[in-house]
Amino acid sequence: MKYLTSAQVRQMFLDFFKEKGHDVEPSASLVPHDDPSLLWINSGVATLKKYFDGRVIPENPRITNAQKSIRTNDIENVGKTARHHTFFEMLGNFSIGDYFKEEAIEWAWEFLTSEKWIGFDKEKLSVTVHPEDDEAYSYWKEKIGIPEERIIRLEGNFWDIGEGPSGPNTEIFYDRGPEYGDQPNDPELYPGGENDRYLEVWNLVFSQFNHNPDGSYTPLPKKNIDTGMGLERMVSVIQNVPTNFETDLFMPIIRATEKISGTEYGSHHEADVSFKVIADHIRTVTFAIGDGALPSNEGRGYVLRRLLRRAVRYAKQIGIDRPFMYELVPVVGDIMVDFYPEVKEKAAFIQKVVKTEEERFHETLNEGLSILEKVIDKAKSEGASTISGSDVFRLYDTYGFPVDLTEEYVEEQGLQVDLDGFEAEMERQRERARTARQQAGSMQVQDEVLGQITVDSTFIGYKQLSTETTIETIVLDKTVADYVGAGQEAKVILKETPFYAESGGQVADKGIIRGANGFAVVSDVQKAPNGQHLHTVIVKEGTLQVNDQVQAIVEETERSGIVKNHTATHLLHRALKDVLGEHVNQAGSLVSEERLRFDFSHFGQVTDEEKEKIERIVNEKIWQAIKVNISTKTLDEAKAIGAMALFGEKYGDIVRVVEVGDYSIELCGGCHVTNTSEIGLFKIVSESGIGAGVRRIEAVTGKEAFLFMAKQLDLLKETAATVKAKNVKDVPVRVEALQQQIRELQRENESLNAKLGNMEAGSLVNEVQKIEGVPVLAKAISGADMDGLRSIVDKLKQEIPSVVIVLGTASEGKVNIVAGVTKDLINKGYHAGKLVKEVATRCGGGGGGRPDMAQAGGKQPEKLQDALSFVYEYVKSIS
């Protein structure tokens, strides 16, 4: 067997299937952009679901890819086993209703055994098949020539992830030799068993059934092939190393980590686990951030945060106590540069994100210790000897606090950890993840009606908004029909259409279809599986029939607003990169008649100054009256002139390029103005964060921008009248004068409050009672706000050397409470924060604070007196 690098194996796989007539599908972003059911792209087939479920008919039914993927369901095993990973590459070949079992099996065998390709020894390969799949069994035995003893029937060889395509599968195993297992009594030592000797290198799935919503299975109209070969596992076999981590995909990362830690890989098992965790997790984090994900407390951002924190925790075990993961990002970029050059291009931004997150986690470890101390204090106060599993899990899951550290600290305090309870919480989390995967993985059941429509339909709406055309197809109630009558809604395909189908963020055109026998309103336009524009129409008068000659007319005013906003979106995208940095990528967009919405990746907030600069740049480009040039080019030609490809989009060999002078060049299939001057005006309406590392700008152009600014001016005029400014330009001066008056009144008020507080404190000194020998003052007073209460409590503590004080005031349906405890009584166990919390709870509120001073609020003023009486009970309980 010849030695191959991982890059060679990947390219060899794609080249092989390209020779077999497959189109090479580029590796899609890890962040799904058209599949809300998925947190991450988690397999090679995940990006092809639209083909398998019939929503889209591919140009070529034969597809191959090398797809980067993320799975985190077995994160606890990563580093501890030979082949568990959170990030991996899946090589696959797929047939959408074209070839089936015979070709899939024959080509797999050729690729694995031919000296031109991998060149495995045929005698080292075994296969498994489903017990009822006699067809596959026969192919392996009769055509390929594998002896019966190396063809194993296994019940588990059936691929089914819920509703949608499913079917039997066959797996190919490579025998690595007796050094990886040679115990004749081992019940798992066989291809398909749990062992390190027989490694699965390829899984061929024969999708021949639909798993229907009612649980039944019916044959698919078109049978499909879906195969998967894990690159990391395959390379470990070819490079003849014990685990995936010794391959050239991981070892450069491990060597770089050795230099940082001063510890040697292979020196002892515990250290090796740390090296493996770090190497795996930095690959995942690097690629995910490169594809637009950012650390956060929810969704995929939470996954990144958890992976980074897990790696940092393991790094401590090999002597690394500082941020370091960011230093490994360029190493990952160098390893993967042949197939994923974008990682190296984005390395600086990825490093910035990783370093910031590492620094935060080092602070979080300290925060976790603080939380743990409170948990321990609570357990002791309740007389418990064990820290609950739920508390341990919360520390681990929310704060990233290691369980072993929790155990260590807890044992130092003479307590124990409920590890069984912790494991139960972990299992509940795993079950939630399993359920989510099952729900996310299911594909839609194939809908054959639209997929079978193959009539030609041409979009002519770039240059004209109306045309004489013919009705080619009518779909009524999911059935192909000859006509549709008044009051009915149907889907219509026209021979030529000026109506734009919703895509790329641009909304569909609206308008009318008028014929000799009736007319209909077009309310929506989507793309059918075979690419035709599918018009949703409601017939208002008469009937529309197949083969009718009709006039299709787009609503011109609406399209005019759309094109202005679409070109403005391109200008905005470029301006964002110019002002915020090249890391900015489109994360979503909406282009309608009234407004545009643009979501983009950005790590941090956008300042007012940055927003003003972005807005100014866009308007300058509008006022420069730049010509917009639209052309078609090959993808390579477009890239050569610097065309910006949108994040997560798929492009063919021929692409449409929209150039706004030399300022903005993007690949785009949408509708645009011919000159930027047509946009007129651009105004940002709002900017906000909508998720982890994703910001949103909403803006208006042209007439809508004018109306927005006119409305803002009206508000300013109203403000001028309110503050009694002579005209709008005097508003800032007038507001500043009013603010100065307010500040002076506040100072006077504070001075009066201080005097009143001193008087109040003087009168309250005489109301101190002794409870069990402890001076206590619990009193409701009037006329003081929270600041006033604090001032009075401070004054009383100065005048009374030893005292517990709780003062409350009720006003306008709210309660304010302040508690204070002198230092001598704190040493005896009295705590203002705990006391004020108890008092506030009794009048419908909450709060807390330091042992010496704390405040709280409540919502039930009528219960304040009863709540204050609790203070005396509290003092007795401590005494």
Curated annotation (Swiss-Prot):
Q: Which InterPro entries match?
A: aa-tRNA-synth_II/BPL/LPL (IPR045864), Ala-tRNA-lgiase_IIc (IPR002318), Ala-tRNA-ligase_IIc_anticod-bd (IPR018162), Ala-tRNA-synth_IIc_core (IPR018165), Ala-tRNA-synth_IIc_N (IPR018164), Ala-tRNA_ligase (IPR050058), Ala_tRNA_ligase_euk/bac (IPR023033), DHHA1_dom (IPR003156)
Binding of Zn(2+) occurs at H566, H570, C668, H672
Q: Name one GO molecular function term.
A: alanine-tRNA ligase activity
EC number of the protein: 6.1.1.7
Q: Does the keyword Transmembrane helix apply?
A: no
Q: Which GO terms describe its cellular component?
A: cytosol
Let me see what the UniProt entry remarks about domains.
Consists of three domains; the N-terminal catalytic domain, the editing domain and the C-terminal C-Ala domain. The editing domain removes incorrectly charged amino acids, while the C-Ala domain, along with tRNA(Ala), serves as a bridge to cooperatively bring together the editing and aminoacylation centers thus stimulating deacylation of misacylated tRNAs.
Task: Tell me which PANTHER family the record gives.
Answer: ALANINE--TRNA LIGASE, CYTOPLASMIC, ALANYL-TRNA SYNTHETASE
Q: What does this protein do?
A: Catalyzes the attachment of alanine to tRNA(Ala) in a two-step reaction: alanine is first activated by ATP to form Ala-AMP and then transferred to the acceptor end of tRNA(Ala). Also edits incorrectly charged Ser-tRNA(Ala) and Gly-tRNA(Ala) via its editing domain.
Family recorded in the similarity comment:
Belongs to the class-II aminoacyl-tRNA synthetase family.
Per its record, how is this protein called by name? Alanine--tRNA ligase
What is the organism lineage in this UniProt record? Answer: Bacteria, Bacillati, Bacillota, Bacilli, Bacillales
Q: Which gene encodes it?
A: alaS
